[in-house]
């Protein structure tokens, strides 16, 4: 399995993703510039956290127009795995690959800490090695991570099992239904505000995020 980590101007978690996949998981990973216009030869795509284009206008609002994004959209529509963390999640909502939106935290402050999550859905390429209902701890670091959707969409997400991760002990940003991560209807696109790539070694505090990437690599072995 060959994995692309997209690098936008202002990305700052691209290296974290690369290290989690390449150094810790021994995966075949390449950085791909936002200036490129194809993803030929790749089997999965990662959109990193950070502040793409300085978060001007709105988080992810300018990144959605990057030359690489039509290829990401086509990649996802072909059923291939696409993952976005933090700013990557915001970009995925901006381009319409994931429903809803991310707005400013209710506290109006940047929040940086480790939070407890509940795993709600293990039937995705990114969560198959977790157990449904399992509690895990992952870091967050964002100012605009409050998930919003209207009542009809929220009901649809819950009914379809599209909520993958939910804030457990506390809701750090005001996300509706305590939502921390969701998939599209097909289940091949996952966006989440927490950073699993920052929790892949005990040196970093815990390894609770490691199975996001190992699940993906196992998926690649099965389909490969």
Curated annotation (Swiss-Prot):
Pathway assigned to this chain's UniProt record: Purine metabolism; IMP biosynthesis via de novo pathway; 5-amino-1-(5-phospho-D-ribosyl)imidazole from N(2)-formyl-N(1)-(5-phospho-D-ribosyl)glycinamide: step 1/2
Signal peptide region: none
One MF annotation (Gene Ontology) recorded for this entry: phosphoribosylformylglycinamidine synthase activity
Compartments (UniProt record): Cytoplasm
SMART domains noted in UniProt: GATase_5
Coiled-coil annotated spans: none
Pfam families named among the record's database cross-references: GATase_5
EC number: 6.3.5.3, 3.5.1.2
CDD domains from the UniProt entry: GATase1_FGAR_AT
Chief location category: cytoplasm
Transmembrane segments annotated in the record for this chain: none
Entry's Gene Ontology cellular component terms: cytoplasm
Keywords (A to Z) from UniProt: ATP-binding, Cytoplasm, Glutamine amidotransferase, Hydrolase, Ligase, Nucleotide-binding, Purine biosynthesis
Catalyzed chemical reaction(s): N(2)-formyl-N(1)-(5-phospho-beta-D-ribosyl)glycinamide + L-glutamine + ATP + H2O = 2-formamido-N(1)-(5-O-phospho-beta-D-ribosyl)acetamidine + L-glutamate + ADP + phosphate + H(+); L-glutamine + H2O = L-glutamate + NH4(+)
GO BP terms in the entry: 'de novo' IMP biosynthetic process
Active site feature: 86, 195, 197
Subunit structure comment from the entry: Part of the FGAM synthase complex composed of 1 PurL, 1 PurQ and 2 PurS subunits.
HAMAP family: PurQ
Known role: Part of the phosphoribosylformylglycinamidine synthase complex involved in the purines biosynthetic pathway. Catalyzes the ATP-dependent conversion of formylglycinamide ribonucleotide (FGAR) and glutamine to yield formylglycinamidine ribonucleotide (FGAM) and glutamate. The FGAM synthase complex is composed of three subunits. PurQ produces an ammonia molecule by converting glutamine to glutamate. PurL transfers the ammonia molecule to FGAR to form FGAM in an ATP-dependent manner.
Protein name: Phosphoribosylformylglycinamidine synthase subunit PurQ
Source organism: Ligilactobacillus salivarius (strain UCC118)
């Amino acid at each position: 399995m060959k994995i692309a980590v997209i690098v936008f101007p202002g990305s700052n978690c691209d290296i974290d993703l690369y290290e989690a996949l390449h150094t810790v998981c021994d995966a075949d990973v390449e950085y791909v510039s936002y200036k490129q216009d194809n993803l030929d030869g790749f089997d999965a795509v990662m959109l990193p956290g950070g502040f793409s284009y300085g978060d001007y206008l709105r988080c992810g609002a300018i990144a959605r127009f990057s030359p690489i994004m039509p290829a990401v959209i086509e990649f996802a529509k072909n059923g291939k795995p696409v993952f976005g963390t933090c700013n990557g999640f915001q970009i995925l909502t901006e381009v319409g690959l994931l429903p809803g939106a991310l707005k400013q935290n209710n506290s109006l402050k940047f929040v940086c800490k480790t939070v407890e999550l509940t795993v709600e859905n293990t039937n995705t390429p990114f969560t198959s090695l977790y157990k449904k209902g399992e509690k895990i701890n992952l870091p967050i670091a964002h100012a605009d991570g409050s998930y919003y959707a209207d009542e009809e969409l929220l009901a649809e997400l819950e009914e379809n099992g599209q909520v993958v991760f939910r804030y457990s002990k506390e809701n750090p940003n005001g996300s509706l239904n305590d939502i921390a991560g969701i998939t599209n209807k097909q289940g091949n696109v996952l966006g989440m505000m927490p950073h699993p790539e920052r929790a892949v070694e005990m040196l970093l505090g815990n390894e609770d995020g490691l199975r996001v990437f190992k699940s993906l690599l196992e998926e690649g072995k099965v389909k490969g």
